[in-house]
């Protein structure tokens, strides 16, 4: 990142940010940039060892105070447990990054029912429930700390079109995009910065979890490149309701929204066979 704390319009210094899915990939990227900008962190994900290692790294590099809360957001009651944990520790969250999520590649008819359920539970239900629970506090933080409170929900370029063999994942991300854009409008008078981040193929563990190689000639974006897009949106005087990382991805998203739906799904269906 090239911007300084003083120049950044999004300045979370002295506040607390919660990052879900913080044990790898974009979650780690968000944690580092938020810590660099002076926020303390609440880190949650399933893998305690990774969270603890990240907390140590953030403390050594930035002097960050991190609270580690290991949770599986696919489990019933995970979000209420997380909120209760925050309340018991008297932690007031000013920035929420709903980064946790995953997809599985394959036809729906062949997918294990528990994994279909878990995709919806993490990508949709947990994101919605956590946002709903913390939104009043985020809005209060935005009033108390102008330019220092934000809601970032992880969508995807998959949100802009149906994707055969990633049907549940793409549909979930379409929900996240629509949900976030509506909240952007609902909260516009509070000063809360709200955006849906839509990355394309990125150098994370997504493809390993999805049991699928990226395929095709496209270059994977780095986590740092995606973070530059995310924080440029937060630094903007008027944070956009969504932001797509990468020029090629922006063109693809625009084309998907402009072409007939039947043609789009035929193209994505053919591409998903690669």
How does the language model describe each region?
Residues 37-54:
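Conserved glycine-rich Rossmann-like NAD(P)H-binding loop of the short-chain dehydrogenase/reductase
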Residues 184-247, 257:
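SDR active-site lid
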